[in-house]
């Protein structure tokens, strides 16, 4: 990764949920591998308890204000407890010399806008797959879902520990399609694989149709082979610079005529990490989240880093 980005820290958002606990452990290990600071935060939103209707007595307004103050004070006290506990979890997941680089903080404001603004200033934001109060088996939590659509940099979404657990040598998987965000995904994936000392599986699924839907029967064998060769060369070109930069990473190239999402989901079942671009070859600048990245994140099968490129040119990537 770029020297400027590598020196930036990692922020993990917490809320006291089991997924949040797992996200803190993951973030602590990743920050240690990068040798950067880890900031544990919880955002406390404002409490609004205005009386119903347009007309109300001043005494009712005062009562509502008092309830708001009491409820907000309770939420702040609870947030400090959650951050303190998460800070301990981060310390336990890190080596003894990391204590000075791990901090905890309670912030105030709307949750998603606050974390989105923070994402401008850090290497990555880490969140749990589901937040407090989420039902088991539910889809992606509202905060995680919103942040992967609006953040100004990479966002890691961490599910509870997958079953069966992934072995330490499980590979990192990255989806490559030639788009700018998949280029950033390749950079992140090579860096993560190198730091973890594991292989990298680079998938290029180059059809928007399944293999049975593709009109292969209308192609002459030589034409089909030429098309496959072209796709394999494209993947090799996309990876060559990163392979030169990370010669220690063993790369397994997978090129298939298929839709990307099902193949990435298949590979995610045995991966310790999946890296995808926020939107692929069918996307456009400013697009929030593509169908492939959304499917992979929503599956909750493995930790996923969504590579997002800042829209503001003044913000470092």
Swiss-Prot record:
Binding residue positions for ATP 2: 175, 208, 277-283, 291-293
Binding of ATP 1, residues: 13, 128-134, 142-143
Induction: A member of the dormancy regulon. Induced in response to reduced oxygen tension (hypoxia) and low levels of nitric oxide (NO).
Domain of life per record: Bacteria
Regions that span the bilayer: none
Gene Ontology MF, one: ATP binding
The entry's keywords: ATP-binding, Nucleotide-binding
UniProt similarity note: Belongs to the universal stress protein A family.
Protein name as catalogued: Universal stress protein MT2052
Species: Mycobacterium tuberculosis (strain CDC 1551 / Oshkosh)
């Amino acid at each position: 990764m770029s020297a400027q980005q590598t020196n930036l820290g990692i922020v993990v958002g917490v809320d006291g949920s089991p997924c949040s606990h797992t996200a803190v452990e993951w973030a602590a290990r990743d920050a240690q591998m990068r040798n950067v600071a880890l900031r544990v935060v919880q955002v406390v939103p404002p409490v609004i308890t205005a009386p119903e209707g347009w007309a109300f007595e001043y005494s009712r307004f005062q009562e509502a204000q008092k309830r708001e103050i009491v409820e907000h004070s309770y939420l702040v006290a609870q947030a400090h407890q959650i951050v303190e506990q998460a800070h301990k979890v981060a310390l336990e997941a890190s080596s003894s010399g990391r204590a000075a680089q791990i901090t905890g903080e309670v912030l105030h404001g709307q949750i998603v806008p606050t974390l989105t603004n923070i994402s401008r200033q850090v290497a990555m934001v880490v969140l749990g797959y589901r937040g407090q109060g989420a039902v088991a088996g539910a889809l992606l939590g509202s905060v995680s879902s919103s942040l992967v659509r609006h953040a100004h940099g990479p966002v890691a979404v961490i599910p509870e520990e997958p079953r069966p657990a992934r072995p330490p040598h499980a590979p990192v998987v990255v989806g490559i399609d030639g788009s700018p965000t998949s280029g950033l995904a390749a950079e992140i994936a090579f860096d993560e694989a190198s730091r973890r000392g594991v292989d990298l599986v680079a998938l290029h699924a180059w059809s928007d149709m399944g293999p049975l839907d593709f009109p292969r029967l209308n192609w002459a064998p030589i034409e089909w082979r030429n098309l496959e060769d072209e796709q394999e060369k494209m993947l090799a070109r996309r990876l060559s610079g990163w392979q030169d930069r990370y010669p220690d990473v063993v790369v397994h190239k997978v090129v298939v005529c298929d839709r990307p999402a099902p193949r990435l989901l298949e590979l995610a079942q045995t991966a310790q990490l999946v890296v995808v671009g926020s939107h692929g070859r069918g996307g456009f600048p400013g697009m929030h989240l593509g169908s492939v990245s959304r499917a992979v994140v929503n599956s909750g099968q493995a930790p996923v880093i969504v590579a997002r490129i800042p829209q503001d040119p003044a913000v470092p990537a």
